[in-house]
UniProtKB/Swiss-Prot annotation:
Family that this chain belongs to: Belongs to the bacterial ribosomal protein bL12 family.
GO molecular function: mRNA binding; structural constituent of ribosome
Quaternary structure, from the entry: Homodimer. Part of the ribosomal stalk of the 50S ribosomal subunit. Forms a multimeric L10(L12)X complex, where L10 forms an elongated spine to which 2 to 4 L12 dimers bind in a sequential fashion. Binds GTP-bound translation factors.
Keywords, sorted A to Z: Ribonucleoprotein, Ribosomal protein
Source species of the chain: Brucella ovis (strain ATCC 25840 / 63/290 / NCTC 10512)
Protein name per its UniProtKB record: Large ribosomal subunit protein bL12
A Pfam family: Ribosomal_L12
One term under GO cellular component: cytosolic large ribosomal subunit
Lineage: Bacteria, Pseudomonadati, Pseudomonadota, Alphaproteobacteria, Hyphomicrobiales
Length: 124
């Protein structure tokens, strides 16, 4: 432990220029670069954009029940298996999610069915 305390004291006594020189010498000795963590952090920043392009799960959101709410309620019941009251509450409480975490094909199919019944639908 005494050796570590001595090293800490010696490092604390270094000037900024000496610390920079020590850093360079250690990089050469150990074959590492102090700039590597910065490059990794910058590369990590691009990950959310890639995730947005590769989205595989979608939420089907009923934006508006439309003028023909009865047909929309019937379609919501058929798609979700909800009871009449729950389906009515969902349609009248729009915007609300009808289905969550479905594939793109299934989401498009549900959207088409609800729009055919007169609803306005969004995929998120």
């Amino acid at each position: 432990m005494a050796d570590l305390a001595k090293i800490v004291e010696d490092l604390s006594a270094l000037t900024v220029l000496e610390a920079a020189e020590l850093s360079k010498l250690l990089e050469e000795k150990w074959g590492v670069s102090a700039a590597a963590p910065v490059a990794v952090a910058a590369a990590g920043g691009a990950a959310p954009a890639a995730a947005a392009e590769e989205k595989t799960e979608f939420d089907v959101v009923l934006a508006d029940g439309g003028a023909n709410k009865i047909n929309v309620i019937k379609e919501v019941r058929a798609l979700t298996g909800l009871g009449l009251k729950e389906a009515k509450d969902l349609v009248e409480g729009a915007p609300k999610a009808v289905k969550e975490g479905v594939s793109k094909d299934e989401a498009e199919k549900i959207k088409a069915q609800l729009e055919a019944a007169g609803a306005k639908v969004e995929l998120k």
